[in-house]
């Protein structure tokens, strides 16, 4: 997957996160759980863009680490939202799967970058 393709994929992930948060019921609990999901989920794409513009290999690795953390955090909030029954599992299943796939891609990229950084 190219950098540009991953930029587009993380952007679309952010858009889907926004729609998922908008689908939450209008309750205090949903608002409290939706805000960090919105922040983490949309920052995946923003931080990946920053990583793509990194000035050094070390900077790239550090910024990808932030992408990894934000993606994992978004997955956590989605799991919690399903667990407390604010949204049905089916509503978030493909979004959770996308978070897992993006996380795997980012982790693999970090490992590859670290190996080539040491050489």
Which residues does each predicted region cover?
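Short, C-terminally biased terminal segments at protein or domain edges
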Residues: 1-119
């Amino acid at each position: 997957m190219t950098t540009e393709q991953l930029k587009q994929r993380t952007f679309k992930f952010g858009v889907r996160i926004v729609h998922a948060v908008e689908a939450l019921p209008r309750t205090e609990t949903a608002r409290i759980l939706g805000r960090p999901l919105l922040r983490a989920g949309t920052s995946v794409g923003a931080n990946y863009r920053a990583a793509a513009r990194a000035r050094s290999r070390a900077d790239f690795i550090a910024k990808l680490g932030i992408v990894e953390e934000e993606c994992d955090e978004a997955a956590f909030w989605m799991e919690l939202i399903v667990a407390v029954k604010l949204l049905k599992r089916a509503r978030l299943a493909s979004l959770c799967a996308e978070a897992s796939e993006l996380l795997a891609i980012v982790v693999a990229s970090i490992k590859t970058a670290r190996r080539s950084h040491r050489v």
